[in-house]
Structure formats: C-alpha cells, structure tokens
Amino acid sequence: MTLRVDESVQGTWTVLRVSGELDLVTSPGLRRQVHAVVADGRRDLVLDLSGVLFCDSIGVGVLIASRRLMRSCQGRLRLILPARGALDGSHVNKVLAALGVRRLFEVYGDVGSAADDLAEPISA
C-alpha cells in the first residue's frame, strides 16, 4: 500500500490528512511535506492520522522528528487519531503507547477540535 497526504487549511492551522501505511518506504514523503509546511512559514500543523492503517517505528520516528521541528521554530503540532482509537483502539495509538511516546503528542479526535485553540487534547 502507499501513503497519501492531502493538504488543507483550517483557520491558522495547516492540516495534512495522511492515509495508507506510514513505514520505511513511505515515511520520507510525509517528512518532506512537514518540512515544506515549515519552509513556507506556517507554524501550526495538524497531522490527521485517522486514515493511517499501519505505522512502524520509522513512521513513529517521522512523527517525533516532526514534533521536534515544529517546537524548534516555536510552532505547534497536533495529531488526530481515529475517533475511538484516540483513546484505545487505533493501530497508531497502540504503536505510540507501546513505544512510550504517546504522551509527547497533543491528540485530538477530529480536525475541528485540533484547530480550536480552546479545545483540550485527549489525555494520554
């Protein structure tokens, strides 16, 4: 399977909707798009991972590197996991939790709440 990344804007937030598999082969594409967002001067980024069916440790590495990049330029990164999965069941959430890095990310249930500066993230 491949990785697809669609870009949109909601308020001040750039939203990258990611679908498919996030792994060794496909992860560089997401990394490039995150870097392009920063190069364009945008500092608020939502990664919508609700369409990601598989994520390996390389994919998690790209998520961590994206967080580091956004923080280094005083930006913000928020993740969206599948509706129920944000709390328990999604593959991505399970991988993040198993690797002990879920707590590093602000996770929201949908784009609307992720792009709302008053909304609270889902607890880890």
Feature names for model-found ranges:
Residues 1-53, 65-124:
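STAS-like cytosolic regulatory interaction modules
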